[in-house]
């Protein structure tokens, strides 16, 4: 769905789209104030949905070969890969890491450092292999000001909830009943979305841990 479509639906919910078949002018009532606030509220909704009920899967490649995969450096007895800027969290519940030959990569010990780096023991890597990791990314937000034809990120079913979120926050200080009606509809649509179900792996203590970072865990996802 495009930003222009979202904006039109929001104005329709607020009865600010047309009067007697004539499009409402920007100077009418609160129209321009609404138009000014809609883009940021759309981005708020896109981010909330993508980090809760419908996360966005993506893939990254790890390799020790030059000009392939993420940037890396040797860091003690580990290899430190720089995570992409849109990294949110690892996806678990399926084959998280595979080689280019289709083998599951059992890292046994990994570490996330400052949500920016992934550290994996050197002994787990082989040159000539390419390792693929599935992760969840942050959504791409609308540029400000957005163009009417700008596409929203995430799957289409998430877009149909966004107008209700935006409309709710446009009236939150003026009409508590209308706010509740819109926000309840937004939550109802989220609740009916097909969940992205996966088994979760939790960080565990590493008895051989060094002082290198923040979180340790086993890569057991298969």
Segments (PLM) and residue ranges:
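Glycine-enriched, solvent-exposed interface loops adjoining structured elements
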Residues: 1-222
